[in-house]
Amino acid sequence: MIIDFRARPPYKSFLKLSLYKPWRPLPEDPAEWGAFELGREPNITADAHDMDAFVKEMDDNGIVKAVLMGRHADDFGIVDNDELYELTQKYPGRFFPFAGINPREEGAVEEVERCISKMGFKGISVDPGWLNPPLKGDDPIFTPVYDK
C-alpha cells in the first residue's frame, strides 16, 4: 500500500501556496535555474486545479491514501483545517488530515483538541522554521501544544 505522506491537493487554501503559483519561464542557461526549478516538469493536474483529477492521478500511480498537512505559517501561507475536514468528507477514507497549528496563535491548544476530538484528525503539523520570526521545534512555546 502506498501512502503519500505530504500531499498538497488543488483545493481551496492549498491553491494560495507558492506551489500553485505560476512558474516563471525557465532560463535557457541551466546555471541560472533555482533549486525549485531543477528537474521540474509540467504538472497538468496541479495546473488544472481539479480535485477529481488529483484523486485519479493518485489512483493511476497506486497511491491509496494521502496525509494532508494543514499549515499556519504566518507569511508563508495558511491551509485551513476546516477545509482539510471537508476533503475527508468528500473522499471518505482517502485522506488523513493533520491540523496546521501555530503556537503563537491564541487558541492553538483548543484548535488541536477540536481537530483531533471533533473532526478525527490524526495529528498536527507545525512549521517552526516558517514562522515569523522562526522558532526551533523544541522552543518552550510548543510545550502546551505538544502536551495536548
Describe each region flagged by the PLM:
Residues 1-148:
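Helix-coil boundary/capping segments in enzymes
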